[in-house]
Amino acid sequence: MNIVATLNKNVAFFYWLQTVSKWDNSYAFEYPLFTYYRHVIQPADEPILSQVRAIIQSDSNPYDILRKLYSEKFDNKNLRLIAHISAPLMDRFDSIWQDCHENLVMWRNAINDFSYDDLYPQLQKIAVFLGLDRQAVQDSTVFLLPPRPEASGPAGHKISSSNFILLRPHYSFNDQKKEAVRIVILHEYAHGLIQQSKLFQEAGRSSYEKFILPKKLVSPPGYTWRSVYNELLAYCIASRTIGGGYLSPQLTGKPRSTVNDMRPSFDRLLAKRKPTLNQIINWASLHMLPKLTDYIEEGKLIDTAIFEPAIKVVDELLS
């Protein structure tokens, strides 16, 4: 198994384009990134962005449009239209690309020096837990994207049915930040396995019907309950916020954190302000970790019980 980082200006351009078009109202939309990416836009560009936004929003599967744009598969008229009308904006994007290019090259080289030998058997166990064949653990490509200068940490995306990960690393490069980037890559890799799992869908649906539906709980703003379940499991596997997650021994060289380990810091957060949805989901995912670890190490398959500890926490903190 290998994960290879690469620089592809066209992929980065289409990621920038979909961000500045502001088509997405889900939790994946990041306003600070939108503001930074958009500072190069001129008033004359607005009709192009409006048209791009309309095309993406009108599609029954917007993320499939993005997947094909990033894969440079312009196999229908809407994809070809986006590529054609957006071409004049490449000059706008170029200043952002040039600003971060040197650091992205350093990140590419650092990521490609990572070893995944110790992670491969663990990922195979996760695949089995999800009801997948061990061969589901395959090579992947990481496309590096321009980060905003003030970003507090790396961020990634994994589009269903794709064989690549989109990654915005830290704006600046140093050795101390490598661990955080590696965790984000494995978090997104976990999403890729989860997206393939019918057992995950069945377990999540059963948990929803048992714990969410009877209480008529409304999903958090920008989320569907399916995306909440997806993030709970992916964070439980790999997360910067909760000390690494299930893969912590391989990613950080440290034991997996427990609820008792992390409770003081979460209590301090609660005393200061209301946690963000991302923090709540991370905290809730930590409550799943003991059961998830037992299931994976014992070769058991995912079921409804995996989610019960986390959903109770989500219910308490969102109610």
Language model features with spans:
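N-terminal low-structure segments adjacent to metalloprotease catalytic domains
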Residues: M1-Q98
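Soluble non-cytosolic domains of exported or imported proteins
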Residues: L7-N8, D113-Y120, Q176, A180, ...
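An active-site-proximal "capping" alpha-helix that borders the catalytic cofactor pocket
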Residues: I126-F129, V228-G243
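Acidic, His- and aromatic-enriched active-site or binding-groove loops in soluble protein domains
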Residues: K158-K177
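Active-site recognition of the HExxH zinc-binding catalytic motif
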Residues: E179-L199
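Post-HEXXH active-site segment of zinc metalloproteases
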Residues: Q196-R226
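Pan-zinc metallopeptidase signature
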Residues: Y246-S319
